[in-house]
Amino acid sequence: TTKQVITEKVIIEKVTPKKVITKQVITEKVTTKQVIAREVITKAETLLNKKNPVLVAVEGRCASGKTTLASVLQDLAGWSVFHMDDFFLQPWQRTELRMQTAGGNVDYERFLAEILEPLKKGETEIVYRPYQCRYQKLAKPVYIKAKQVCLMEGSYSCHPALWDFYDLRIFLTVSPQEQKRRILARNGEDGYMPFAKQWIPLEEQYFKAYQIEERCDLHFTLC
């Protein structure tokens, strides 16, 4: 699938010293990612008029473009970004009961304690240890400065234990066919199988159990 490009007309009004209004039409090409990002930024800036900080969640299906959108938002608006991938379960946490529980496939307790609760308290520097899948252990602490808008990116970011902390919740979706194509392109045939057999079914179980998609504020399909 090629990137969808939209021609957008921006009208700029200028007032001269003689109070004559002149209009200049600027045409620029923007991708759907940028269009979506601008809509999200507008929503967040409106919320900033009422509270600070504003906490935004980007939830959705794997390979739907969550990380890509988060990167665009960070580039355009300078938001702080926190990734749910840094909060995978450690081996000792992956009990049979935990993995059978909808939404249990992430350490939401640690995400709550180390990210969301400090942000809600107004802490300006967040410290946490990302989980390293390669080594199956936590890495050294990282330090992230909390901006006026903080974005939580990744599947399970809208888990019921985390839901009420957010001011804006975004859901990204993708068709099964496009999802498979993207994962194959990114991870190869061998890398696709764990997604097909485990990760995608766990996500869909979680979405259905808590009606995550239906309850989110904004919904997008990212090209």
Predicted regions and their residues:
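Small-molecule kinase domains that catalyze NTP-dependent phosphoryl transfer to phosphate-bearing small molecules
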Residues: H159, G188-C223
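Hydrophobic positions on the alpha1 helix immediately C-terminal to the Walker A/P-loop
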Residues: L69
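P-loop (Walker A) phosphate-binding loop of NTP-binding proteins
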Residues: R61
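ATP-dependent NMP and nucleoside kinases share a basic, alpha-helical "lid"
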Residues: Q136-R186
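Extreme N-terminal, non-catalytic leader segments
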Residues: T1-K3, E28-L55
